[in-house]
């Protein structure tokens, strides 16, 4: 059985959820609930660190899009962390988002420090 974990940290005004494992039909409800919990606590600046996610299906992408929509509805910010390089020139999640044409919807950074830095520019789409 593959382990799926979501850990929570704070970096100043930013909440950071570090996700590891497979983001799929079975695990995406866990991430969805954690995002809702963060927003319910009044934290509207969120980084989803997906650098340790090695598989993502359409359910996982759906959670990412729903998270973006939720945070935008409360004037919040969502940033994703995907490694600039990884499994054959990019992470699996990066490839899936690109193949579905939704990568451009997200502000993507290489690591937590760049994601929470107000002066850092996101990686190109």
Go through the PLM ranges and name each one.
Residues 59-60:
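Helical "lid/switch" subdomain of P-loop NTPase nucleotide-binding domains
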Residues 1-54, 66-125:
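STAS-like cytosolic regulatory interaction modules
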């Amino acid at each position: 059985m593959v382990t799926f974990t979501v850990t929570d940290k704070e970096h100043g005004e930013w909440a950071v959820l570090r996700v590891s494992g497979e983001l799929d039909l079975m695990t995406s409800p866990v991430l969805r609930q954690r995002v809702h919990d963060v927003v319910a606590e009044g934290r509207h600046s969120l980084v989803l660190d997906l650098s340790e996610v090695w598989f993502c299906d359409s359910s996982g992408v759906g959670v990412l899009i729903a998270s973006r929509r939720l945070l935008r509805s409360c004037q919040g910010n969502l940033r994703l962390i995907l490694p600039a390089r990884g499994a054959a020139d990019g992470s699996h999640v990066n490839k899936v988002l690109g193949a579905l044409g939704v990568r451009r919807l997200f502000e993507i950074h290489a690591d937590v420090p760049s994601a929470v830095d107000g002066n850092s520019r996101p990686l190109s789409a």
